[in-house]
Amino acid sequence: MKIFSVTDPEFKPYGRVVTGLDTTKAEILAALANTPLPAATDYVAEDAALQELPAAVEVSEHLFGGMPCQLGWCNGHNTYLNCLEYHRDSEFNLGTEDFVLLLARQEEIAGGKLDTATVKAFRVPAGTLVEVYATTLHYAPCHVDAAKGFRVLVALPKGTNTAKPAIKNDGGDDPQLWACNKWLLAHPDSAEAKAGAYVGLVGENVHI
């Protein structure tokens, strides 16, 4: 699978590289370096050590326009797609090491299904802050170097990925709602599908 860079023009429909905020990025990277590095993949929606940084205020004000936000992380080792998710808002990522994002576009969903042949891979250099647009489907990062794994900031509006509301399926993308502000399409081979997530990915479970 070809791996593009987030600096390539192919990334433009999916997100952007955020420039500036050098002090903010340095604070976050220093704190991220002290977070766990599991053998598999782990996600924490809001990490107290990150949330208490002065950088958290900067993220809220500069990246979310003053909206309350949460700073968490996704760390570990991974080489598979497994699922794709989207939110109603952008997500911001920043890694201590190079990592790869597997991405698709919401408009590529047809009849509640997405063909994984449409997925593209983008390498994010260490220390590069990226915005992943709300219309971009994404999931856990993939590592570039198995010896280093990945430690990646996940900044989102506050409450995202917490417990979902108790709603009945009333059409639209309701069946895909897996958590608060999180709509998920799982591959049938994934652990999420076995746990009851909506199976919306068809084709190969992309592996890099």
Task: Outline where the language-model segments fall.
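Histidine-centered metal-chelating micro-motifs
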Residues: 128-130, 135-139
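Active-site region of the double-stranded beta-helix
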Residues: 1-126, 140-208
